[in-house]
């Protein structure tokens, strides 16, 4: 490789600084000032055409200039509202319209306080399972729907639609029998995938047939225990279909005007999209059976937005009435649940249909206890206690939708209607699960009365009390009723024979007891739990509930001594006989009261407190006493690294305060004192563990020593830092994670170079001794192959050596003669400087050569341009070889099309601008030799 000599350009730092200063411009009193008060000008705009072209007129007491921003507004601009306070009528109008809009928006969206259906889906699938065999009808995929040419006449289209649907209903299906639950789920997933595949291949009729077939499955209650899970699986397919249809029609609305806005109106929808939408509704209307017609139309309910503003509000009541034709009460209630779910998604503000669904359900509620249902249960061998919980997911969802943000009067009416029905335990449980906790809590005694009147045979009372307890854990009942509520509930709970039923209820009511009563009542409850769970070691099957009880108790007892004074608390802990559970419970108690920290956290906390104390201690001008305090502190806290770091910083600050007091002119006494401070730091730093902490403290302490004219001590610090660089590991731990160390090493070395500029050479060592030692260490350090930090360091070395070759350095330390004063342009010094520069250049160019690979061309381009900029800033380009090297680097940066064109253009413009400065004519010739790469 050819050797390029380095020639530093001469710098006049004062002149460069003066040329970089901002130009001062006198500001007259009447001119604009950024802090001048803002004057609001009312702008009124008048809408001229539908396309949004406006003509605006502005009125102002101070100016008649038209506001350019007002031309794009359709109405009053927001800032003018505040300026229009002089017109009370306008203010009232704006306020009223804003209130109405806000109220409408509040009802148009479902907030985060509404639990979504997705949260209930997994729970339903896990709870409602079966071991019985299932059957399913699979669509075999007739091709008739896609055959033949498109009919032109309307009657032909209608006949074609009916034939396509009849083809499905007349035998294009296959019944699969004796399926396990998992097989059934897999078949449903296959149907879901078939729907997506058919849609993707533009077989829309086939997709509709699949959805119809799936909807028909919801009329089958042959395996009644599995029906809620079947409903979840089938409605997933319906949701997919509805989404596909909506997105298809929405995509058809994209034209030259762009896509539809989020809140579009039917006027924005083109005729093609409307016709397609109507076609879907006509096809669905052709379905003969009620249940599939209902479900498929409900799934695309949102598409009514494309046809009419009132389409959804008109369809919801009609679909609600359609459900009245479904005879099976279980199928009916889930149909209502699906309609409520779709309604809440597309039009949550339409509360009437939700309320109508609820009251229609109440009218048919007695069917649950009718002969038809009883005969069906007998035929399937299902007991009423197992049948009634099947209604819970659907009823809970309906109640949740109706009660969401419902007024108090409606909730009261709903409760009264439920109260009038017989055998209403199921209804009561749904009310307590869905209504607001505050509503339930304020009427706790009313609900207890209703629970007492319920028939035990239909729905267990302990489940009702559990639901009531859940609400009372979230909201407080009237204070006068609290004890009576606990007594009434516990009378029922304590009589439960099943340990599992008992603990499920007791777990909920323990929190109510802890919230509102003393340790006496809590002790009584714990004693009752021990009494019920100890026989036959029943507690072994209920560890999660028992752990929950412990957490609730300790959450309300903030005093450790009070908790352990509860007589039955320790016997309660004795029930945790499984070792892992016992450890977990004890850990929970310890964290609640002791807040035990890990060892490292504890050290960090102690160190933080000690450091705060050290910084507060001051002996005024008695600096020697201050240093003695720091020496004593070091001996006491030698195991706490953060404290040692703080002590080193404090001693360095003490040395600088001494310099400040002496104004840089040390006496014999103060000179000895600052040397003692420097020695303190030099002795303490090696005891630290963190390598970058040591490196930075060596550098910082060396700077302090240099500022106090302790030159030999400063050299010792810098030599120690240089000798420590080879020990830097490849990665370091930061916040428990391993990070590469090279970026931190690069940052440290760049700071070090800035200090080395002003460090004078030791008379007994060679020229630039510290720089040569540091370059040797950098050369021997093992760098990552994928990293360019080594070359960035060598580039920084070039910057340092260029600054060192100047007649006068950029900055100095007071009363310290740097090398510019010591050598005064000596040829031996400059020759050594040039030698080191050439060595650094060789390293840079060799690295650039190794990057001539496809995967490294981008890095080569960036580094080449960076080195070019370094030569431009620090090199003397009047030298022909250096000039040629810069041209080569320019071409290298652009060779493979990896360079950023904007950066190259700006760089070239900068060169041309600099060429106009005095003694910079040679840059004009350089600019002519630097072509810009064109991309075609």
UniProtKB/Swiss-Prot annotation:
Keywords: Endosome, Membrane, Phosphoprotein, Protein transport, Transmembrane, Transmembrane helix, Transport
Residues bearing the modification Phosphoserine: 265
Protein source organism: Rattus norvegicus
Topology within the bilayer: Single-pass membrane protein
Major place of residence: membrane
Name this protein carries in UniProt: VPS35 endosomal protein-sorting factor-like
Stored InterPro entries: VPS35L
Function: Acts as a component of the retriever complex. The retriever complex is a heterotrimeric complex related to retromer cargo-selective complex (CSC) and essential for retromer-independent retrieval and recycling of numerous cargos such as integrin alpha-5/beta-1 (ITGA5:ITGB1). The recruitment of the retriever complex to the endosomal membrane involves CCC and WASH complexes.
């Amino acid at each position: 490789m050819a050797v390029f000599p380095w020639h530093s350009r001469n710098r006049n730092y004062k002149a460069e600084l003066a040329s970089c200063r901002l130009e001062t411009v006198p500001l007259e009193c009447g001119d604009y000032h950024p802090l001048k008060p803002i004057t609001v000008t009312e702008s009124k705009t008048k809408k001229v055409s539908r396309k949004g072209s406006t003509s605006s007129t502005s009125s102002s007491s101070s100016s008649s200039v038209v506001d350019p921003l007002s031309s794009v507004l359709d109405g009053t601009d927001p800032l003018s509202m505040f300026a229009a306070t002089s017109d009370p009528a306008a203010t009232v109008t704006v306020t009223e319209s804003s209130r109405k809009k806000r109220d409408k928006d509040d009802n148009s969206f479902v907030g985060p306080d509404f639990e979504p259906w997705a949260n209930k889906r997994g729970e339903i699938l896990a709870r409602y399972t079966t071991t019985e065999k299932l059957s399913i009808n699979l669509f075999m995929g007739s091709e008739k729907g896609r055959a033949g040419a498109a009919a032109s006449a309307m009657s032909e289209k209608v006949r074609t639609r009916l034939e396509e649907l009849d083809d499905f209903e007349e035998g294009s299906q296959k019944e699969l029998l004796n399926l396990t639950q998992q097989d059934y789920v897999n078949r449903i997933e296959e149907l879901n995938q078939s729907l997506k595949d058919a849609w993707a291949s533009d077989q829309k009729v086939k997709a509709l047939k699949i959805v119809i077939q799936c909807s028909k499955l919801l009329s089958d209650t042959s395996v009644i225990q599995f029906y809620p899970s079947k409903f979840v699986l089938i409605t997933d397919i319906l949701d997919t279909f509805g989404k596909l249809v909506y997105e298809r029609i929405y995509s058809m609305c994209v034209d030259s005007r762009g896509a539809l806005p989020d809140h579009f109106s039917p006027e924005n929808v083109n005729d093609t999209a409307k016709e397609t939408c109507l076609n879907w509704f006509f096809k669905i209307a052709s379905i003969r059976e009620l249940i599939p017609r209902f479900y498929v139309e409900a799934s695309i309910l949102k598409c009514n937005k494309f046809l009419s503003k009132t389409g959804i509000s008109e369809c919801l009541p009609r679909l609600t009435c359609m459900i009245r034709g479904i005879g099976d009460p279980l199928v009916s209630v889930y149909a209502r649940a699906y309609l409520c779910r779709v309604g809440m998604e597309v039009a949550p503000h339409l509360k009437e249909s939700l309320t109508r669904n609820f009251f229609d359900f109440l009218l048919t509620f007695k069917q649950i206890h009718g002969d038809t249902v009883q005969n069906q249960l007998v035929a399937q061998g299902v007991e009423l206690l197992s049948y009634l919980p099947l209604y819970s997911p659907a009823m809970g969802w309906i109640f949740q939708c109706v009660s969401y943000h419902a007024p108090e009067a409606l909730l009261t009416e709903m409760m009264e209607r439920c109260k009038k029905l017989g055998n209403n335990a199921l209804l009561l449980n749904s009310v307590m699960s869905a209504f607001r906790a505050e509503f339930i809590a304020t009427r706790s005694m009313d609900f207890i009365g209703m629970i007492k009147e319920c028939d035990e045979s239909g729905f267990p009372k302990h489940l009702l009390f559990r639901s009531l307890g859940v609400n009372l854990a979230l909201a407080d009942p009237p204070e006068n009723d609290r004890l009576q509520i606990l007594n009434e509930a516990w009378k029922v709970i304590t009589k439960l024979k099943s340990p599992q039923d008992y603990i499920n209820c007791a777990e909920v009511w323990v929190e109510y007891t802890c919230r509102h009563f003393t340790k006496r009542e809590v002790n009584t409850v714990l004693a009752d739990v021990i009494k019920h769970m100890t026989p036959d070691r029943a507690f072994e099957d209920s560890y999660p509930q028992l752990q929950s009880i412990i957490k609730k108790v300790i959450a309300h007892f903030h005093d450790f001594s009070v908790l352990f004074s509860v007589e039955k608390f320790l016997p309660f802990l004795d029930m945790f006989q499984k070792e892992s559970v016992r450890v977990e419970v004890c850990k929970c108690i310890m964290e609640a009261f002791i807040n035990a920290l890990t060892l490292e956290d504890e050290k960090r906390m102690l160190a933080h407190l000690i450091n705060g104390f050290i910084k507060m201690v001051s002996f005024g001008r008695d600096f020697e006493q201050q240093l003695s305090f720091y020496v004593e502190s070091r001996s006491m806290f030698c195991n706490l690294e953060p404290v040692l770091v703080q002590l080193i910083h404090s001693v360095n600050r003490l040395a600088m305060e001494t310099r400040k007091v002496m104004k840089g002119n040390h006496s014999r006494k103060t000179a000895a004192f600052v040397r003692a401070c420097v020695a303190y730091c030099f002795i303490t730093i090696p005891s630290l563990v963190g390598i970058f902490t040591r490196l930075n403290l060596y550098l910082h302490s060396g700077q302090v020593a240099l500022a106090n004219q302790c030159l030999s001590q400063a050299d010792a610090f810098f030599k120690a830092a240089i000798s420590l660089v080879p020990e830097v590991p490849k990665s370091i731990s930061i916040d428990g994670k391993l990070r590469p160390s090279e970026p931190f090493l690069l940052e440290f070395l760049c700071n070090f170079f800035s200090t080395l500029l002003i460090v004078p050479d030791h008379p007994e060592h060679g020229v630039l001794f510290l720089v040569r030692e540091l370059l040797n260490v950098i050369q021997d350090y093992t760098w990552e192959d994928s990293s360019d930090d080594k070359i960035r360091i060598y580039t920084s070395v070039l910057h340092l050596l260029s600054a060192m070759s100047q007649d006068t350095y950029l900055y100095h330390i007071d009363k310290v003669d740097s090398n510019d004063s010591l050598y005064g342009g000596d040829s031996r010094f400059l020759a050594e400087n040039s030698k080191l520069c050439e060595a650094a250049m060789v390293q840079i160019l060799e690295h650039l050569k190794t990057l001539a690979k496809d995967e490294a061309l981008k890095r080569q381009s960036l580094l080449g341009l960076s080195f070019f900029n370094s030569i431009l800033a620090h090199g003397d380009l009047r030298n022909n070889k250096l000039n040629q090297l810069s041209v080569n680097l320019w071409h290298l940066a652009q060779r493979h099309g990896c360079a950023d064109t904007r950066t190259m253009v700006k760089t070239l413009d900068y060169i041309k601008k600099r060429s106009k400065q005095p003694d910079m004519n040679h840059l004009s010739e350089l600019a002519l030799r630097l072509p810009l790469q064109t991309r075609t």
